[in-house]
Amino acid sequence: MAIQNAYLQGVYEGLAKRNPEQKEFLQAVEEVLESLEPVVAAHPEYEKAGLIERLVEPERIIMFRVPWVDDAGKVQVNRGYRVQFNSAIGPYKGGLRFHPSVNLSIIKFLGFEQCFKNSLTSLPMGGGKGGSDFDPHGKSDAEVMRFCQSFMTELYRHNGPDTDVPAGDIGVGGREIGFLFGQYKRIRDEYTGVLTGKGIPFGGSLARTEATGYGLCYFAKEMLADAGKSFEGQRVVISGSGNVAIYANQKATQLGGKVIAMSDSNGYIVDENGIDYKVMKEIKEVKRARIKTYLDYVPTAKYVEGSQGIWTVPCDIALPCATQNELRLDGAKALVANGCYCVAEGANMPSTPDAIAYLQQNGILFAPAKASNAGGVATSGLEMSQNSLRLSWTFEEVDERLHNIMVNIYKTAAATAEKYGMKGNLVAGANIAGFEKIASAMMSQGIV
């Protein structure tokens, strides 16, 4: 599907002309603009106010060098980013990603998606994203600490609890957040909720670690229930083996599903008896080892080289939880051919546009990431609330709030899709629902 509306088409063409090399960012923008056609057609005042032009252009982009010294005494230099995309509904909020693939296009796409995701939570959070091409894998704790301290030595001047509140993402877990927070506190000499995903002893929220994976399953549960189905007795395939995948495994299992396959960038494992999330957590979070190590714990499991093959494993429910554009058209065809009837995205934009189109054409229940993986940032918002109130809620309290937020996101996306004559199209429903709140705020605040 291509953009039909002349105004939206003109905005997209102008954006593509200015950013021809930023394919991930352009992909994210195109998907959203396609969904917004009926809304923009009903509101000609948006064009007069240049609303869409402002929506797709970040308010601020920060790029900086990050020099640090490795354990051999050699100076290394990486590049750091922070894209402060939109603050119409609250302070910039979004994670930091440390991975060799990180570039400006990826950070801009993530920041753009974050705007709509944060809007859907109904919490007062704008959209932003950041990171670096630094690879924490294979680095010592001391090297990671030195890098994080150097990174924050520049980033601190752009952050603040009411300005910009980063969190974790790929390559940025509790260890990295701790180092970043420590350096911020040292430089600013103040103790504020400037980062989320912190450790429990220094202002973190219970259930934050589990939130994205749990939230994904809560969203999928609602979507399945509307179709008269549930997780009970279903075969579940989860790509990835990081934070999102591990806790999606735990919650899917608690809801009655059986997770039979998981992956990392090297390959995937199949365990017909159900993959034990505790074993996966030990391998990935404690040993920081490759997924093949699962065979040392469960010799009856099978390991296959190459992560793409995971989509050929017969399943009922697929949860892509690894990285962007991992589920391509061939993977979507394999899922449909093998009887999969539900795909819910746990990673950010893990499915390519042609894969999504194929799944929708074949009647597959499809949950888009900006709605179904919003649990992480929702609980980050709850962590910000606890920090502001100087309170700490119990795990059960946070989990209940998370569950309610995910149920409301599903209902809002589904109702919005139906309102605009696209019943069941949660991609359009989530895009429009997220946009409407941001658009209303931007129109109220003038040309800024």
PLM regions and their residue ranges:
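N-terminal ligand-binding/catalytic initiation module
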Residues: 1-206, 437-446
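Adenosine-phosphate binding glycine-rich loop
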Residues: 2-28, 223, 336-448
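Predominant activation on well-ordered alpha-helical scaffold segments within soluble catalytic domains
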Residues: 12, 30, 104, 108-112, ...
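Active-site nucleophile and cofactor-binding loops and adjacent substrate-binding regions
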Residues: 73, 169-170, 205-212, 237-241, ...
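Glycine-rich beta-alpha junction loops
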Residues: 84, 129-132, 171-172, 242, ...
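General beta-strand structural signal in soluble alpha/beta enzymes
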Residues: 163-167, 190-195, 238, 261-264, ...
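Glycine-rich phosphate/diphosphate-binding loop of Rossmann-like nucleotide-binding domains
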Residues: 196-199, 204-312
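Rossmann-like adenosine-cofactor binding region
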Residues: 267-366, 371
